[in-house]
């Protein structure tokens, strides 16, 4: 695979290899055959980052080969959304002959939605001044005149210039309901929107007969919290990143959801609060004992759950675990399987044509 070519004819084979690999990894914990959720074979990535290469008067996007570290010119990127591909051409055309925009520009980041909105961030090794702002405003207006719903941001050391806003609002159809998600530039969002919809619908389906409340760790912008709220009396969710918490609070209001509470704290801190080890000012006014959480949802970073959080989640009758790294999932299952059994297993092909796998398990208490 190269940045400008996807081996779409190999999609079925690469997916079958992942299914077999996941089933083998999970064999010590479950004999289940994974439920498989396929990705679109192209234009599935909603965000992308490129370095810029200045070659005389020429200017183009580049990526680096992971093995050789050699430079690869990228004029089209079929893994990315159609909107990103359109913007790549438009940005090069708009920046190439404009000194204020081109000088010391070293990277462009693209974030798009299925609702055809975009934030484009231009990263510089220089101070950004009023001349840059005027040139960027003119470029933004020219892009909008082409029918592109785009917002531009300039970034440099200790500097961030938003021409109007640093976010876009995604609208996802999830099990018959549209959910609005505010996505903030430079914050985590699910890269494969079509796969995200399938993950949300799977999580809804496996929790459809739930009782009591839901506790979620690592909630981000409320991606799962908002979708799962309809299956539970109340949802209590934690997140450490301020921009993600702010986006989650906006999303709760925008979707008119009244049973989700977001707390800004790390999963490890919440574990300490639940165990009575420490008290936190951020929990003032929140009576944790009022929540009857029978299900806990975790979507941890690649490192998986730490040992204290492992112990904490074992106290819940049901554990819904979305993993971006099956190796750390299996490491966690060495502990979790002592008290719980795997009752559902899913593979989400979040990153086609790579070795990466995203998977989900539902664990029920023995």
Curated annotation (Swiss-Prot):
InterPro entries: MeTrfase_TrmA_AS, MeTrfase_TrmA_CS, SAM-dependent_MTases_sf, TrmA_MeTrfase, U5_MeTrfase_fam. One of its GO terms (molecular function) is rRNA binding. It catalyses: uridine(54) in tRNA + S-adenosyl-L-methionine = 5-methyluridine(54) in tRNA + S-adenosyl-L-homocysteine + H(+); uridine(341) in tmRNA + S-adenosyl-L-methionine = 5-methyluridine(341) in tmRNA + S-adenosyl-L-homocysteine + H(+). The keyword Transmembrane does not apply. Dual-specificity methyltransferase that catalyzes the formation of 5-methyluridine at position 54 (m5U54) in all tRNAs, and that of position 341 (m5U341) in tmRNA (transfer-mRNA). Its EC number is 2.1.1.-, 2.1.1.35. Keywords: Methyltransferase, S-adenosyl-L-methionine, Transferase, tRNA processing. The keyword Zinc does not apply. Belongs to the class I-like SAM-binding methyltransferase superfamily. RNA M5U methyltransferase family. TrmA subfamily. S-adenosyl-L-methionine binds at residues 190, 218, 223, 239, 299. This is tRNA/tmRNA (uracil-C(5))-methyltransferase. The active site is at 324 (nucleophile), 358 (proton acceptor).
């Amino acid at each position: 695979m190269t940045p400008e070519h996807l081996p779409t004819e190999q999609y079925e084979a690469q997916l079958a290899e992942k299914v077999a690999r996941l089933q083998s990894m999970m064999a010590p914990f479950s004999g289940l055959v994974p439920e498989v959720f396929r990705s679109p074979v192209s234009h599935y990535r909603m965000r992308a980052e490129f370095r810029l290469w200045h070659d005389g008067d020429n200017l183009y996007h580049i990526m680096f080969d992971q093995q050789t570290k050699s430079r690869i010119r990228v004029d089209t990127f079929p893994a990315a959304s159609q909107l990103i591909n359109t913007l790549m051409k438009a940005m090069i055309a708009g920046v190439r002959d404009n000194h204020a925009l081109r000088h010391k520009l070293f990277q462009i980041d693209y974030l798009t939605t299925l609702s055809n909105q975009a934030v484009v961030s231009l990263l510089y090794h220089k101070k950004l001044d009023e001349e840059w702002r005027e040139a960027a405003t003119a470029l933004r207006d020219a892009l909008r005149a082409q029918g592109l719903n785009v917002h531009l941001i300039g970034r440099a050391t200790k500097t961030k210039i938003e021409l109007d806003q640093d976010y876009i609002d995604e609208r996802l159809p999830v099990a018959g309901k549209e959910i609005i998600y505010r996505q903030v530039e430079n914050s985590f969002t699910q890269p494969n929107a079509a796969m995200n919809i399938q993950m949300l619908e799977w999580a809804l389906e496996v929790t459809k007969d739930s009782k009591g409340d839901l506790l979620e760790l690592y909630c981000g912008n409320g991606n799962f919290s908002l979708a799962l709220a309809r299956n539970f009396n109340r949802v209590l969710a934690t997140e450490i990143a301020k921009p993600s918490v702010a986006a989650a609070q906006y999303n709760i209001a925008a979707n008119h959801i009244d049973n989700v509470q977001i707390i800004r704290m790390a999963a490890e801190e919440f574990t300490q609060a639940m165990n009575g080890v420490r008290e936190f000012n951020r929990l003032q006014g929140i009576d944790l004992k009022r929540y009857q959480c029978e299900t806990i949802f975790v979507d941890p970073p690649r490192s998986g759950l730490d040992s204290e959080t492992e112990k904490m989640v074992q106290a819940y009758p049901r554990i819904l675990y979305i993993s971006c790294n099956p190796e750390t999932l299996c490491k966690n299952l060495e502990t979790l399987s002592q008290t719980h059994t795997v009752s559902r297993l899913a593979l989400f092909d979040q990153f086609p044509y790579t070795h990466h796998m995203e998977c989900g398990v539902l664990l029920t208490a023995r």
